[in-house]
Amino acid sequence: AGPFRFPRCRKEFQQAQHLRACQQWLHKQAMQSGSGPQPQGPQQRPPLLQQCCNELHQEEPLCVCPTLKGASKAVKQQIRQQGQQQGQQGQQLQHEISRIYQTATHLPRVCNIPRVSICPFQKTMPGPS
């Protein structure tokens, strides 16, 4: 069942259009080298991050991490496909993919989600599949 141990989280994920803004944000962060955004007040949040936070605030706390994991997985696949089209080296892809998960891990804290501060994604970097 992928990241969704709870069927209702899968439903929330679909209703939230797969956290579209979060996916775009994760994608953007993955493509930028350097460290991701530090937790900031809402004033300094880029609009896209703000949209992503809004999406996460609509989830039940229980579903925040599973839906984020689903979004991360989707972005990972996009990046992998793009990388193959551009003939990217595996190592660069791994960096980008690990940045997706780094960014996603801290999103609940960046977004001040109640009762969720960090999503414990496994840092296991799967080899090229």
Curated annotation (Swiss-Prot):
Pfam family, one: Tryp_alpha_amyl
Single GO molecular function: nutrient reservoir activity
Coiled-coil annotated spans: none
Regions of compositional bias (Low complexity) in chain numbering: 32-47
Subunit organization: The mature protein consists of a small and a large chain linked by two disulfide bonds.
Purpose: This is a 2S seed storage protein.
Keyword annotations of the record: Allergen, Disulfide bond, Seed storage protein, Storage protein
Name by which UniProt lists this protein: Allergen Bra j 1-E
Protein family per UniProt: Belongs to the 2S seed storage albumins family.
Species for this entry: Brassica juncea
Span list, region Disordered: 28-47
